[in-house]
């Protein structure tokens, strides 16, 4: 059986009050429309078509790696009109098409699979997704036959007294036999107060043709649409709970999961402990037995097993197993830190490689450098990597001891097994096995304060 999907992503999203199309706003690190696309893919649906309109180029840019096709809806004349705009996608296809909305990011791949299975096994012409809610005010009601089939969808304003008591509501997501849908679209009109073409009318047309219409009931959170920043926040809360629950089931400890923020594509190994206030973003991979103390942010990075991070920021970098980072360290993009290293408080590392067992304990800046293993950086060391025009490189070998308050003026090389005296400004290569001293000789002028009249008596 051939299955495909159409995702409606042309809405203007006026209530978002944004220059961006609504569907590219993110929920837990991923655009809403990409949540829908990815879950459709997980349900083994290969052919996906996006109906786009406002901000179409922006939507294309955010979905360009998703292998989807596009249909253009120049004017937004209703959901039915949006599907009409995708007729070319459906042309010459036979099978089943599901229709989803790009602003409902909480739909799961399990529900999508259930929708197709229910529709195809029951040989329905149309199947819709519904939900039961305590307060259905404002929603279209699902009215069923005694057999359980869907009889009709009635908009709230058109409900009679009995229909108002119904708490099963329409989600705006459907499954259709493609041939039935295309035939029904030919009979769709915009004879209503808004002058729009409604997809709900296709259900009525299908029913009048004598075809079966079914419905599956899912939790309300799965059909939640996002039309405002408030609803975006509500969707974020639901998604975050799902994400954190998944990690806890997989063996991750959260001290307070309500105040831990993890993007949907993050992977975390078992026996890792996460304290409140941590933010883990992008495609970060955290291995087992790590400890992330409060107020740490990690984005698009790989963290080895047994790493401890405390009150620090790690961006687009790799941290080797057994390393400790922080408190208050800043690991900038393109940094690779080896195993069992120590990156301490108020240390900033940018676009550098740090070897195994190297200690950079406090108040140090390292940029555009290659640092070997078992090195020690004293407090206040600065790699002076910028000459006013471009960044220069510093190379430090293994077992180098860098004294406190040292400036390494790039480009410069410090070879293996070297010492640099505290307070030095290094501008030339330091040979292997040597001690480098680059500071002025101390001069003591005895009696100077008394001569200047500065000595307090």
Curated annotation (Swiss-Prot):
Residues 251-457 are annotated as: N-acetyltransferase. One of its GO terms (molecular function) is glucosamine-1-phosphate N-acetyltransferase activity. It is an enzyme of class 2 (transferase). One of its GO terms (biological process) is UDP-N-acetylglucosamine biosynthetic process. Pathway: Nucleotide-sugar biosynthesis; UDP-N-acetyl-alpha-D-glucosamine biosynthesis; N-acetyl-alpha-D-glucosamine 1-phosphate from alpha-D-glucosamine 6-phosphate (route II): step 2/2; Nucleotide-sugar biosynthesis; UDP-N-acetyl-alpha-D-glucosamine biosynthesis; UDP-N-acetyl-alpha-D-glucosamine from N-acetyl-alpha-D-glucosamine 1-phosphate: step 1/1; Bacterial outer membrane biogenesis; LPS lipid A biosynthesis. Residues 230-250 are annotated as: Linker. Transmembrane segments: none annotated. It comes from the Bacteria. The active site is at residue 362. Catalyzes the last two sequential reactions in the de novo biosynthetic pathway for UDP-N-acetylglucosamine (UDP-GlcNAc). The C-terminal domain catalyzes the transfer of acetyl group from acetyl coenzyme A to glucosamine-1-phosphate (GlcN-1-P) to produce N-acetylglucosamine-1-phosphate (GlcNAc-1-P), which is converted into UDP-GlcNAc by the transfer of uridine 5-monophosphate (from uridine 5-triphosphate), a reaction catalyzed by the N-terminal domain. This is Bifunctional protein GlmU. It comes from Clostridium botulinum (strain Hall / ATCC 3502 / NCTC 13319 / Type A).
């Amino acid at each position: 059986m051939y299955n495909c999907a159409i995702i409606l992503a042309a809405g203007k999203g006026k209530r978002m009050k944004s220059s961006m199309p609504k569907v590219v706003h993110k929920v837990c690190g991923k655009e809403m429309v990409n949540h829908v696309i990815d879950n459709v893919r997980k349900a083994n649906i290969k052919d996906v078509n996006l109906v786009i309109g406002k901000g179409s180029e922006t939507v294309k840019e955010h979905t360009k790696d998703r292998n989807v096709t596009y249909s253009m809806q120049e004017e937004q004349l209703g959901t039915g009109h949006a599907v009409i705009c995708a007729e070319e996608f459906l042309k010459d296809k036979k099978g089943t098409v599901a229709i989803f909305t790009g602003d409902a990011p909480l739909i799961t791949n399990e529900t999508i699979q259930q929708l197709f299975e229910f529709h195809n096994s029951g040989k329905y012409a149309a199947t819709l997704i519904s939900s039961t809610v305590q307060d259905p005010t404002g929603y279209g009601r699902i009215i069923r036959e005694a057999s359980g089939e869907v009889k009709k969808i009635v908009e709230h304003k058109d409900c009679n007294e009995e229909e108002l008591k119904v708490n099963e509501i329409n989600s705006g997501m459907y499954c259709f036999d493609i041939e039935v849908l295309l035939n029904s679209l030919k009979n769709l009109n915009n004879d209503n107060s808004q002058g729009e073409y409604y997809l709900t009318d296709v259900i009525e047309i299908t029913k009048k043709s004598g075809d079966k219409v079914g419905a599956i009931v899912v939790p309300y959170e799965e059909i939640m649409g996002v039309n405002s920043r408030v609803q975006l926040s509500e969707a974020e809360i639901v998604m975050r709970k799902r994400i954190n629950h998944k990690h806890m089931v997989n063996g991750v400890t959260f001290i307070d999961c309500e105040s831990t923020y993890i993007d949907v594509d993050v992977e975390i190994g078992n026996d890792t402990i996460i304290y409140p206030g941590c933010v883990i973003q992008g495609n970060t991979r955290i291995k087992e037995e790590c400890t992330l103390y409060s107020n740490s942010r990690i984005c698009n990075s790989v963290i080895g097993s047994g790493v401890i991070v405390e009150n620090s920021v790690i961006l687009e970098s790799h941290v080797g197993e057994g390393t400790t980072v922080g408190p208050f360290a800043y690991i900038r993009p393109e940094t690779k830190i080896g195993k069992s290293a120590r990156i301490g408080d108020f240390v900033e590392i940018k676009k550098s490689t740090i070897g195994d067992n190297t200690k950079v304990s406090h108040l140090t800046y390292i940029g555009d450098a290659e640092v070997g293993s078992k090195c020690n950086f004293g407090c206040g060391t600065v790699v002076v990597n910028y000459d006013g025009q471009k960044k220069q490189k510093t190379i430090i070998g293994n077992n180098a001891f860098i004294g406190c308050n040292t400036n390494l003026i790039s480009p410069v090389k410090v070879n293996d097994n070297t010492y640099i005296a505290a307070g030095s400004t290094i501008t030339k290569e330091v040979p292997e096995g040597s001690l480098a001293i680059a500071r002025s000789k101390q001069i003591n002028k005895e009696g100077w304060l008394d001569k200047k009249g500065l000595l307090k008596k």
